[in-house]
C-alpha cells in the first residue's frame, strides 16, 4: 500500500494538521512532527480509528510499548505523591483539635479562678475596654502612650492608666507573637504578686494636663527599670509635632536685640535690615550641606546637569572624570558607564530614566490592546538568500510577473512587498536584497515576518549571505523553510546543500529534523505549488491572529519621494485595519492617509492585518523599519512627531566630544586625514542607508569618505550649491537622473555629478577616487654596483672616481649611494659619467668608467657605488 501524508489524513477527518500530530503523539507515535510526514496505510488506519473512537490498535501498541510503560510508572508515582499529601493533611487536621482542647482547658481554668478575686475581674474588664479604645483612637492614643514614657524619664506623676499602658508595652516587647489568651494569663500572674488592691480609674484622655502619679513611688513597679538608654531607643513622634513651636524661641533674642538697638541707635531699623540680608546665605549653606543619597536622572545628561542633580560643583565632576582618564567639558554628554562610576565615587544611588518613554507611541498602543475580536490574518513570508540564487525569479513565477528582468544588473537593491492568493487565502511576500551591502534590509525583513524562505542554489551551495540570512531568521525566532532552487541545471546537487545546512543545525525532515526542504525550479516552475502548500500548512500551525477592528499598527519596510505624490511608504499591517483618512504617526513623520494602493498600483480603501500596500500623505520620508500607528487626532500625531524630532535633534547637536587620554594622540593624528567630501542622493531610504554604510567602511589610516549630506529624492540646486561650497566634493546619485537645468548649474559651478544604477559600480568608482588621493608607495629598483679603484682630484670639478662595474649598469641621472665598509656614507645624484673621454648614458658590467657624484668629495679607494632609481606605485583600497 502507498504511504499517506499526515495533511491528507487531516483533510479526510476534517481536522487541522496540528491536531492530528497531537493525536498521533498521544498514541505514542512521537516521530510524527511535520504535516508532510508520510506513514503506512496501517498506521493511518490506526490514527483514523483513534480519532473516531479513541481505541489504539495492536499495530500502534507494538511500536509504542516501552513509552506506555514509562507513562504508567509516572502515573503510579503521581498517585503515591497524592497519597502522601493526603496523609500529611490528615495529620495536620489531627493536630489542630488537640490545640483547641488545650485552649478550652485554659479557659476553664480561668473561669474557675475568677470568683476568687473580683478586683482582678474588674481590672481585666478595664484592659479589654482599653484595647477597644486603642482600636478606635488609633495613632492618637499611641502618641499619649509615648508621652507617658517620656514623662517617666523626667520623674513626673502619671495616671494609673499610663502605668498599665507601659506594662502592656514591656510585656508585648517580651512576648511578641503570642495569642491574647497567653497575654491575659501573664497579666493574671502579675496580679497575684501585688499585695495592695487597686481602685478603678477613668480612661486617660489625649490631653497632657491629666491626673499624674509617681511611678517610682509604687513598690509594685520595682522590677521595671526605665534607663536613659532605653528611652533613647524608643522613638517619640510627639517631638516632631512640637517642632513648629521652636522658631518662636529662636526669634525672642532677636526681639531683645531690636529693642536694644532702638534704645542705643535711632537708626536701629537699618541695622535690623542688614542682619536680615545676612541670613539667606546661611540657609543656603544648610541646604547644600544636606547629603543627596539617591537621585533620578535621564539617560541623556550633560556634565553640568549631572552636577546640578548631585548638588556638586561642575569643576568637581570634570576633575573626577579627568582622574578616571576622561577629558570632558561641561556640555558633554555622559554615557551610562560614566554615570555609574561617578555614582559609586560620590556614594549616590542613581535611577536612570529614559526620556524616550514620554513619546513611545508603540508602547502606549501595545498597553491598550486586548485579546478581543481576534481573527485569522494573512501570513507574512520573507524570501532571503545569497545574491543571484534566484529569489526574485522564484517570486516572479509565483506572481506571474517579470520583476527580475527589469532590475539593474539583475540584482535586487531594495525591499519589495507583494500579495499572492493561493486556495482563496492571501499570502504576503517580502523580497530582500542578497548583496552584502544590504545587511540592514535583510535584518528588517526578518524582524517583521512570520515565516522565512531561504533560497539556496543547488549548483552553488551555501554562501556567506545564506549563512547571514539564517542567522537573522534564528535571531528573530522565525520558522525556516529551505527552497533548493535551480534544480533544472545539470550540475544540481541537492544532497550537497542538505549536508552543508545540516552543519548549521538546519536538518531536513527526511533526516529526522524539523525543517522542510523543497526542491524547486524558478525557471520551469517545478515544486512551486508544493512550496506554497507547505507555507500555508506552517501558517496554520502558527495560528496567526489579529484584531481587524483595532487601530492600525504597521511596519514601514521602504520609503521614498515620488514626483507629484510626495513622501511614499511601503507598509505591512500587523494589527488592526488602516483606512483612507486615518491619522498616522511614524517616527518624525505624521499626517493623514490621502491614498493607498497595492503592489500592482490598484487603488485601495483599506489594508487589513497581514496585508501590504503603499500609502501617501506623510509629512516627510519616514525611516525604513519605523513602526506606523493610527491615532485618534492630528494634534496627538503632531505632538508625538514633534517630541521625537526635538529629542533626535538635541541628540544630534549635542554629540559628545569627550576623549580619553589614550585616544588623544589618535584624534590629533586623525586631523591629518584626507577626506573625500560626498553628497549622496538615492531613490529609496533603504538603498540610501546601505550605500552610506558601505561608503563609511571605505577608509584607512590616510583617507576616508566624508558624507556631508544625504537624502531621498532627485538632485536639487541646493545640493549643487553645497557641493560648490565644499572643496573637491562630488555628487553621487543612485537610481536617479539630474534634469538639464541641474546639469547646466553643476557645469557652471564646476561640480561633478555621477549617477549609478548598480551598487557595485558606485563602490568601485569611489574606491578608485580614494586611491588617487592617497600618497603613492615609493619603492627602490636596484640598477647596478661599481667598485672604486682610483680617485682623481680635478680642479674646479672635485673628485672623480675611477670604477669597475661589478653588477648591472651605472646610469647617468640615476641616484647614487656611496658605501664604505657596509655603511652608507653619502647619497646623491650622478653628475658625470665618462668612458675614457666620452660622455656616456650608461656603463655595463665588466667595463671601467669615471663617475662624478654631486657634492661628494670624500671618496676613497675600496668604496662601492650603488646605482638605483625610485619607482612610484599607485595605492588602491
UniProtKB/Swiss-Prot annotation:
Keywords: Cytoplasm, GTP-binding, Initiation factor, Nucleotide-binding, Protein biosynthesis. GO terms for molecular function: GTP binding; GTPase activity; translation initiation factor activity. The keyword Protein biosynthesis applies. Residues 431-434 are annotated as: G3. GO terms for cellular component: cytosol. It is found in: Cytoplasm. Residues 66-115 have a biased composition (Basic and acidic residues). Gene3D superfamilies: 1.10.10.2480, P-loop containing nucleotide triphosphate hydrolases, Translation factors, Translation initiation factor IF- 2, domain 3. Residues 385-392 are annotated as: G1. Residues 66-127, 187-208, 241-290 are annotated as: Disordered. The keyword Ribosomal protein does not apply. Residues 192-201 have a biased composition (Basic residues). Residues 521-523 are annotated as: G5. Residues 410-414 are annotated as: G2. Signal peptide: none annotated. It holds the Pfam family IF2_N. GTP binds at residues 385-392, 431-435, 485-488. Residues 245-265 have a biased composition (Polar residues). Belongs to the TRAFAC class translation factor GTPase superfamily. Classic translation factor GTPase family. IF-2 subfamily. This is Translation initiation factor IF-2. The gene is infB.
